[in-house]
Amino acid sequence: MTTEEIRMLTKKELVAEYERTIKWYKEHNINRNFSKYAEMFWILFDDGANSYMWAIDAICSWFSDCNKEELEKELDGYI
């Protein structure tokens, strides 16, 4: 996906992309210790092509059980 395509993702498309990504990790025996929302963050963040806060805000605005402070704390060690 291009950065522009990522910016235009809907919530439904993000969930589908997340599910494809997790399936690929499992098929390739890749274990990642990130929460669901952290994995979604990595998809939206797109290696820094998109804003850190934009990605976090988008996820937490779409998912009511997303805790912004907890997500930021989880990501702090990586960014």
Positions of the model-derived regions?
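Acidic, low-complexity, intrinsically disordered interaction modules
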Residues: I22-I79
